[in-house]
């Protein structure tokens, strides 16, 4: 059952017509700014992939994919849940070099999503991926990319306020980002659930990048589920903002430096997913045939929620 609510006494800053205009403006401005900032080029994205390739996102490993068979060839296809793995292969196939990347307008169906104000069966994302050097696989590099994305959000917001004066009563976000690991967050709030920890910290500190998601913490449990075959769990995170109308933190982007052959090898075993080693994508990563990359997804709908109040 959906848990979507409209907060008491909530009044939108824009009427319905201007809201639609503003949504289009946000999508255009942010995509252009993100591409300029990270040196990305738009490519077309698939709506579905062959199940046998291992390219679909398994999310937490329990969500059912929308699957269908194709009459021509008897191929089993799956509607994408994200393009996390597809993008890395595409960078190789398209011949992208170090320092350049791609982004897609990704549309997905997640049939097992729990519905609320922030989650839908239909998922839209700017899915992006960029080729990096092996020596760029560091926390410092990851943090610099996070700061670049937040700066793109702030630049979009300032332009939006200039175009829609009705939004000028909303407070502007700053480019400042607080970085904290999931273990540090658990140590700070040991008696709270992971989501309660996020809410408490982001309400106090504002824009936050929560790092190192996927591996078990000292408590024996991971902060949140994360697939073992695209993000390096030591070099990933969620970009969190405070949502004032909903009075909660929420994730604008999940992103990270992608697995090396060594980290995929370790994480597949940790997650009990060694059977995936036989899939074409996983073979390619383990053999070192795919480029080192960083990437993530950014939700246009969530960005509009953030900037339109």
Give the location of each predicted region.
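Class II aminoacyl-tRNA synthetase-like tRNA-binding/catalytic domains
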Residues: 2-119, 127-131
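Short acidic (Asp/Glu) and glycine-rich catalytic loops that position anionic groups and cofactors
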Residues: 5-11, 124-125, 260-262, 284
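Extended, charged alpha-beta segments that form solvent-exposed binding/catalytic grooves
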Residues: 99, 104-196
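Generic recognition of stable, solvent-exposed alpha-helical segments in well-folded globular domains
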Residues: 18-25, 29, 137-144, 148, ...
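Surface-exposed helix-capping loop/turn segments at secondary-structure junctions
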Residues: 36-43, 158-163, 306
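A general structural signal for short secondary-structure junctions and capping/turn motifs
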Residues: 68-70, 92-98, 118-120, 169, ...
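Generic, well-ordered alpha-helical scaffold segments in large soluble proteins
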Residues: 29-37, 148, 152, 306
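A translation/RNA-centric and nucleic-acid-associated enzymatic feature enriched
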Residues: 109, 179-309
């Amino acid at each position: 059952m959906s848990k979507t609510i409209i907060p008491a006494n909530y009044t939108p800053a824009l009427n319905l017509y201007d809201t639609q205009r503003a949504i289009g403006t946000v999508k255009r401005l942010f995509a252009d700014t993100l591409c300029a900032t990270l040196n990305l080029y738009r490519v077309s994205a698939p709506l579905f992939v062959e199940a046998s390739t291992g390219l679909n996102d398994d999310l937490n490993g329990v969500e059912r994919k929308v699957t269908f068979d194709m009459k021509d060839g008897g191929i089993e296809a799956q509607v994408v849940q994200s393009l996390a793995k597809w993008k890395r292969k595409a960078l190789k196939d398209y011949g992208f070099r170090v320092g350049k990347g791609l982004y897609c307008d990704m549309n997905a169906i997640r049939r097992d999503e729990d519905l609320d104000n922030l989650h839908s069966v239909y998922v839209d994302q700017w899915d992006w991926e960029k080729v990096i050097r092996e020596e760029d696989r560091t926390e410092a590099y990851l943090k610099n990319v996070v700061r670049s994305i937040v700066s793109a959000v702030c630049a979009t917001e300032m332009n939006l306020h200039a175009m829609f004066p009705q939004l000028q009563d909303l407070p502007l976000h700053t480019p400042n980002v607080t970085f904290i690991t999931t273990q540090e967050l658990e140590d700070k709030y040991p008696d709270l659930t992971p989501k309660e920890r996020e809410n408490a910290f982001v309400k106090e500190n504002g824009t936050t990048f929560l790092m190192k998601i996927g591996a078990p913490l000292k408590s024996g449990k991971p902060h949140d589920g994360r697939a073992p075959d695209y993000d390096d769990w030591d070099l990933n995170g969620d970009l969190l903002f405070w949502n004032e109308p909903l009075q909660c933190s929420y994730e604008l982007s999940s992103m990270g430096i992608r697995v090396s052959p060594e980290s995929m090898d370790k994480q597949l075993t940790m997650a009990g997913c060694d059977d995936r080693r036989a899939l074409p994508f996983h073979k390619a990563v383990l053999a070192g045939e795919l480029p080192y990359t960083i990437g993530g997804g950014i939700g246009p709908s969530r960005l509009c929620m953030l900037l339109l109040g």
